[in-house]
Amino acid sequence: MAAMSEDSCVNFKEMMFIDNTLYFIPEENGDLESDNFGRLHCTTAVIRNINDQVLFVDKRQPVFEDMTDIDQSASEPQTRLIIYMYKDSEVRGLAVTLSVKDSKMSTLSCKNKIISFEEMDPPENIDDIQSDLIFFQKRVPGHNKMEFESSLYEGHFLACQKEDDAFKLILKKKDENGDKSVMFTLTNLHQS
């Protein structure tokens, strides 16, 4: 077994108990990672539900619609999602935000478990391990699909649900019995 490099070790100068919890105080904390999300780079994509309907942001409300490629191109500011990837101090999936840009940037939020696009740029840094803006993009085993779990509401995923005569993007607790409403196809687009 190979020995660990000293560069990957942390030297401690002190240990202390506070409220029955043992804390280690490092000599230097400059190399320690904090619990946060740091924005890295972005890509653009079109998201489709299991019925091949395109995610369309209409007045900051996300809905799924049947669209031809020509319709999609004509509606590009509302169908072209900007997916920012974030560095995550924990391993829970690819941390991302989902945004669209028409005249202004809007970013998807799941505040209070309500899905909407808020007029804002995705933040450079989020000093927490949970956020209403961060979703964990994960590959669905056995499918060529993705799912997006909320970092704020563990076990809750973006999903497509029919309401009245529209298909809407919602946040819901995932049904463990092969729930296809949380599965999406991402088609990456060329950066312009």
From Swiss-Prot:
Q: Which Pfam families match?
A: IL1
PTM comment:
The pro-IL-18 precursor is processed by CASP1 to yield its mature, active form. The pro-IL-18 precursor is however not processed by Casp4/Casp11 in rodents. The pro-IL-18 precursor features autoinhibitory interactions between the propeptide and the post-cleavage-site region, preventing recognition by the IL18R1 receptor. Processing by CASP1 induces conformational changes to generate critical receptor-binding sites. The mature form is then secreted and released in the extracellular milieu by passing through the gasdermin-D (GSDMD) pore. In contrast, cleavage by CASP3 inactivates IL18.
**Main location, first listed in the record:** cytoplasm
MF terms in GO: cytokine activity; interleukin-18 receptor binding; receptor ligand activity
Top-level taxon in the UniProt lineage: Eukaryota
Pro-sequence residue ranges: 1-35
GO annotation (BP), single: interleukin-18-mediated signaling pathway
The record's annotation in SUPFAM superfamilies points to:
Cytokine
Q: Where in the cell is it found?
A: Cytoplasm; Secreted
Quote the Gene3D superfamilies the UniProt record gives. Answer: 2.80.10.50
The reply to whether NADP figures as a keyword in the UniProt entry is no
| Residues under site feature: Cleavage | D35, N36, D69, I70
Keywords, ordered alphabetically: Cytokine, Cytoplasm, Inflammatory response, Secreted
Q: Give the InterPro entries listed for this entry.
A: IL-18, IL-1_fam, IL1/FGF
Q: Which residues form the signal peptide?
A: none
Return the GO cellular component terms, semicolon-separated: cytoplasm; extracellular space
Its family?
Belongs to the IL-1 family.
Subunit description: Forms a ternary complex with ligand-binding receptor subunit IL18R1 and signaling receptor subunit IL18RAP at the plasma membrane. Mature IL18 first binds to IL18R1 forming a low affinity binary complex, which then interacts with IL18RAP to form a high affinity ternary complex that signals inside the cell. Interacts with cargo receptor TMED10; the interaction mediates the translocation from the cytoplasm into the ERGIC (endoplasmic reticulum-Golgi intermediate compartment) and thereby secretion.
Q: What's this chain's function?
A: Pro-inflammatory cytokine primarily involved in epithelial barrier repair, polarized T-helper 1 (Th1) cell and natural killer (NK) cell immune responses. Upon binding to IL18R1 and IL18RAP, forms a signaling ternary complex which activates NF-kappa-B, triggering synthesis of inflammatory mediators. Synergizes with IL12/interleukin-12 to induce IFNG synthesis from T-helper 1 (Th1) cells and natural killer (NK) cells.
Tell me the protein's name: Interleukin-18
